[in-house]
Amino acid sequence: MVKMLTMDKILSKKIKVNWLGGVFWLLPNLLDLFSASKRKASVRPYQSLLELVQENFLNRYDLVHFSFNGDHDFFHFNDLQAIRSFNFTIEEEQLGAMQPDEVLLFEPVDRVTVELDQKGLSLIHSGKAFCASANYFKHWLKRVPQQDKVTLVWRKSGFELKQ
């Protein structure tokens, strides 16, 4: 499923990707299947997430919601963060030692913190991952100018401001 959203000059896109047979398959949305463009309706394998992102021009989007068919070792999530040049990874060993009320924190840009709690980590584990640009996170500072620092949490619908 592919859906484009715009929010205050922030481009966002939702895509569904299957990891099958050691390759990534980008699934077209229903409308693209009936498109006159063969490129939009085609389904083909990609050897890496970087190849998929580059060939589909996904770097031009500030936020891409990925829906994988599972990401139990956080391999895909970690690759997405590396593609956006964020030095943040999730390791299974970290999660095993976490208490239910503990969170993982990372700061993609100054004054913006992403808090991954059990609910957010569970979403990523099930394949609902994000690939956001530094511009996207800076945009949150503009949306909430009265706050010196912004904390975001990852949810199924996207990032939410932590109250």
From Swiss-Prot:
Kindly give the InterPro entries that the UniProt entry links to this protein.
MPN499 (IPR054961)
Kindly provide the name given to this protein in its UniProt entry.
Answer: Uncharacterized protein MPN_499
